[in-house]
Amino acid sequence: MSLAGGRAPRKTAGNRLSGLLEAEEEDEFYQTTYGGFTEESGDDEYQGDQSDTEDEVDSDFDIDEGDEPSSDGEAEEPRRKRRVVTKAYKEPLKSLRPRKVSTPAGSSQKAREEKALLPLELQDDGSDSRKSMRQSTAEHTRQTFLRVQERQGQSRRRKGPHCERPLTQEELLREAKITEELNLRSLETYERLEADKKKQVHKKRKCPGPIITYHSVTVPLVGEPGPKEENVDIEGLDPAPSASALTPHAGTGPVNPPARCSRTFITFSDDATFEEWFPQGRPPKVPVREVCPVTHRPALYRDPVTDIPYATARAFKIIREAYKKYITAHGLPPTASALGPGPPPPEPLPGSGPRALRQKIVIK
């Protein structure tokens, strides 16, 4: 439940409403437009024979669709007189012009003088404004405005006219001397600061730790040297042209600049950094170059029976003949005799490769 509905009504409620309604002036727009809306006596032009309360229905609505005449030649019946329609009513607009109030000449002159003394916020143009300002507040504001005006007038009288006296030659010289001293002090301070800056030598900052430098340049292109040409003196041929004849004469044609190529260099500050980025693995074992015992040449093959390297077919035949003589003189090994004729089986040797399992025979 709202507070307005539950509280008791005021005793003075609605006292000013009647005064506002009486003070409301009529707008001239509705008195002149469309001939005015005021009621005039003897205006019977828009009064009909029948009352406006009765609802009149057109004759066309009384006829049913089935009862319409089939021919159009019949005379149309006169329609009944319709009700007169008047213009719609609009809400009157409030007038913006101030209401003229008849006041005596003496009181209006006095009010105009008091109005000129007040500030713009408190000036009343005589219209019926709806400002709700208490009389005591308006009086205090007026007194404050008068005090401010009086204080401003006293300050103007105290200051008087403002005029500057031209300085004499002695006063100008004294001011110039003071300015010169200030300039000398400023110059000395500036020179001292410049000297301090020169003393502080800018040292190149060195970066601690390893450094990798990347440098890319262009260099002239150097081709690979070709086969050296030998001068051969053959009778009946023309002599070789001289060097002066081979060189082109100046101005005979455009000289092409030498070709250039780019080269990039990466420099490491120490070896540890280089090894960190480019680690070197263990060097591969270089295989031992075996020599043929017959021809003393690099061996290309190996005998599967005697495990002796050889280079040529003749060396292979010599190795086999020596092997047969060895078997004839010393006989086969125990394992070979048990297995019968044929190539001897390999001897098992612990910790040896597949080549070490073969039977080795040294030929002297």
Swiss-Prot record:
* Gene for this chain: VPS72
Q: Which UniProt keywords apply?
A: Chromatin regulator, DNA-binding, Isopeptide bond, Nucleus, Phosphoprotein, Transcription, Transcription regulation, Ubl conjugation
Instruction: Describe its function.
Output: Deposition-and-exchange histone chaperone specific for H2AZ1, specifically chaperones H2AZ1 and deposits it into nucleosomes. As component of the SRCAP complex, mediates the ATP-dependent exchange of histone H2AZ1/H2B dimers for nucleosomal H2A/H2B, leading to transcriptional regulation of selected genes by chromatin remodeling.
For the biological process aspect of GO, one term held by this record is: positive regulation of double-strand break repair via homologous recombination
Q: How does it assemble?
A: Component of the NuA4 histone acetyltransferase complex which contains the catalytic subunit KAT5/TIP60 and the subunits EP400, TRRAP/PAF400, BRD8/SMAP, EPC1, DMAP1/DNMAP1, RUVBL1/TIP49, RUVBL2, ING3, actin, ACTL6A/BAF53A, MORF4L1/MRG15, MORF4L2/MRGX, MRGBP, YEATS4/GAS41 and VPS72/YL1. Component of a NuA4-related complex which contains EP400, TRRAP/PAF400, SRCAP, BRD8/SMAP, EPC1, DMAP1/DNMAP1, RUVBL1/TIP49, RUVBL2, actin, ACTL6A/BAF53A, VPS72 and YEATS4/GAS41. Also part of a multiprotein complex which contains SRCAP and which binds to H2AZ1/H2AZ.
Provide the record's note on post-translational modification. Phosphorylation is enhanced by ZNHIT1 and promotes the interaction of VPS72 with histone H2AZ1.
Compositionally skewed regions (Acidic residues) per UniProt: 40-75
Q: Where are the transmembrane segments?
A: none
Q: Which domain of life is it from?
A: Eukaryota
- Residue intervals annotated as DNA-binding region are 156-206
What name has this protein been given in UniProt?
A: Vacuolar protein sorting-associated protein 72 homolog
Protein family membership: Belongs to the VPS72/YL1 family.
Covalent link (Glycyl lysine isopeptide (Lys-Gly) (interchain with G-Cter in SUMO2)) residue numbers: 115
Mark the residues carrying the PTM Phosphoserine. 127, 129
InterPro entries, alphabetized: Vps72/YL1_C, YL1_N
Q: Where is the composition biased (Basic and acidic residues)?
A: 127-142
Native species of this protein? Pongo abelii
Q: Name one GO cellular component term.
A: protein-containing complex
As one GO molecular function, the record gives:
histone binding
Where in or outside the cell it occurs: the entry states: Nucleus
Compositional bias of type Pro residues: which residue ranges? 341-351
Region labeled Disordered — which residues?
A: 1-164, 233-258, 335-357
Where mainly located? nucleus
